[in-house]
Amino acid sequence: MKDWLDEIKWNSDGLVPAIAQDHKTGRVLMMAWMNRESLALTAAEQRAIYWSRSRGKLWRKGEESGHVQKLHELRLDCDADVIILMVEQLGHIACHTGRESCFYRVYEDGQWKIVDPVLKDPDAIYSAGH
């Protein structure tokens, strides 16, 4: 039997883009990267675990903020090169800016307009004890 992780077309860095969506509304919350280990751990632990390219290590979503993403479903696209995670976003904040989604800007009249409010000050999110 073929390993399910072998079916994924990893990029030259051994990564695959992963899009987190709210499992109830379908809203796109964020995009991050996963490597083989982070995807396997995500499936095993039923929570989103990404690969931080800037830190060069596993990133358990919510480990600092408390805003864990509980996994409901994993999906692989037709080309096998993008993952979608259907998640329950604990705390309703996915973005490090304190917003529900990282996609809070809309292109309008030649510029990016902020359309989603900050739900919690990022300084308060990432301080001790969240």
From Swiss-Prot:
<feature type="binding site">
    <location>
        <position position="77"/>
    </location>
    <ligand>
        <name>Mg(2+)</name>
    </ligand>
</feature>
<keyword id="KW-0028">Amino-acid biosynthesis</keyword>
<comment type="subunit">
    <text>Homodimer.</text>
</comment>
<comment type="pathway">
    <text>Amino-acid biosynthesis; L-histidine biosynthesis; L-histidine from 5-phospho-alpha-D-ribose 1-diphosphate: step 3/9.</text>
</comment>
<dbReference type="GO" id="GO:0000105">
    <property type="term" value="P:L-histidine biosynthetic process"/>
</dbReference>
<dbReference type="GO" id="GO:0000287">
    <property type="term" value="F:magnesium ion binding"/>
</dbReference>
<feature type="binding site">
    <location>
        <position position="79"/>
    </location>
    <ligand>
        <name>Mg(2+)</name>
    </ligand>
</feature>
<dbReference type="GO" id="GO:0004635">
    <property type="term" value="F:phosphoribosyl-AMP cyclohydrolase activity"/>
</dbReference>
<comment type="similarity">
    <text>Belongs to the PRA-CH family.</text>
</comment>
<dbReference type="GO" id="GO:0008270">
    <property type="term" value="F:zinc ion binding"/>
</dbReference>
<keyword id="KW-0862">Zinc</keyword>
<feature type="binding site">
    <location>
        <position position="78"/>
    </location>
    <ligand>
        <name>Zn(2+)</name>
    </ligand>
</feature>
<dbReference type="InterPro" id="IPR038019">
    <property type="entry name" value="PRib_AMP_CycHydrolase_sf"/>
</dbReference>
<keyword id="KW-0963">Cytoplasm</keyword>
<keyword id="KW-0378">Hydrolase</keyword>
<feature type="binding site">
    <location>
        <position position="95"/>
    </location>
    <ligand>
        <name>Zn(2+)</name>
    </ligand>
</feature>
<comment type="function">
    <text>Catalyzes the hydrolysis of the adenine ring of phosphoribosyl-AMP.</text>
</comment>
<feature type="binding site">
    <location>
        <position position="81"/>
    </location>
    <ligand>
        <name>Mg(2+)</name>
    </ligand>
</feature>
<keyword id="KW-0368">Histidine biosynthesis</keyword>
<keyword id="KW-0460">Magnesium</keyword>
<dbReference type="Pfam" id="PF01502">
    <property type="entry name" value="PRA-CH"/>
</dbReference>
<keyword id="KW-0479">Metal-binding</keyword>
<dbReference type="GO" id="GO:0005737">
    <property type="term" value="C:cytoplasm"/>
</dbReference>
<feature type="binding site">
    <location>
        <position position="102"/>
    </location>
    <ligand>
        <name>Zn(2+)</name>
    </ligand>
</feature>
<dbReference type="InterPro" id="IPR002496">
    <property type="entry name" value="PRib_AMP_CycHydrolase_dom"/>
</dbReference>
<protein>
    <recommendedName>
        <fullName>Phosphoribosyl-AMP cyclohydrolase</fullName>
        <ecNumber>3.5.4.19</ecNumber>
    </recommendedName>
</protein>
<dbReference type="InterPro" id="IPR026660">
    <property type="entry name" value="PRA-CH"/>
</dbReference>
